[in-house]
Amino acid sequence: MVAFDANEILTPFCEGHREGAILFDCQRMRQVEYGLFVPAWWGERAHPVSEGGRGSAWFVEASFGNAVLRQYRRGGMIAMLNRDRYFWCGGHRTRSVLEFRLMRELISRGLPVPTPLAACYVRYGVQYRAAILIERLEGVSSLAMCIRGNSKETHWEQIGRMISRFHREGLDHADLNAHNILLDPAGQCWLIDFDRGALRIPATKWRERNLARLLRSLLKIRGERSVDAVYRDFERLRRAYDLAWSRGC
């Protein structure tokens, strides 16, 4: 369960004939409006994120700092019928609000997570659309970018230890892949994209599912690297993960 946070403010709004709300961090943002979650509103201050995702993220230059705007989009076959609407189960159950609060909880536990700034949803009868604004981490490269660039600084052991920390706190990451692991110039590892993530009692089944998903991601982006090379790198990560887990860290 995510703890109550006194720094959260929920502001209802109307957009045309639609109702919605914005949940935001009042220490980072003084005023909010629906336009913050619309790429066109930013004009030349919005730049599409080229890596990962479904064409649903933008870097934005704001008075409250550089941020990432991400609109929630569906993937797979269902996206052909319904690209960005989800079934309404109440404002507190929208994907943007759940992710915002989960990220704040993880930060409170000392985990390397970028700061969520604001979450938005707009209701359409029994459906809704959603978006989220997150602090941009400057100078970072994804694990996928490091691999494709043949970087020698992939920090496999450090990544393994980081994942162990998240699992120790009970985070079941719904999409652990090479695009969602970031490395900054100081060598710090970060984890992003907590949509559909959840805090659970640490258990082998979901931890192994997370790691298996990461391995599939590494194999998918291997390019000219051999399968054996991918498995060797992953084994380095896995050994560090297992050691950290056995030590309770």
From Swiss-Prot:
It is found in: Cell inner membrane. It catalyses: an alpha-Kdo-(2->6)-lipid IVA + ATP = a 4-O-phospho-alpha-Kdo-(2->6)-lipid IVA + ADP + H(+). The keyword Cell inner membrane applies. GO terms for molecular function: ATP binding; kinase activity; phosphotransferase activity, alcohol group as acceptor. One of its GO terms (cellular component) is plasma membrane. Signal peptide: none annotated. Keywords: ATP-binding, Cell inner membrane, Cell membrane, Kinase, Lipopolysaccharide biosynthesis, Membrane, Nucleotide-binding, Transferase. Pathway: Bacterial outer membrane biogenesis; LPS core biosynthesis. Its EC number is 2.7.1.166. HAMAP family: KDO_kinase. This is 3-deoxy-D-manno-octulosonic acid kinase. It comes from Xylella fastidiosa (strain M12).
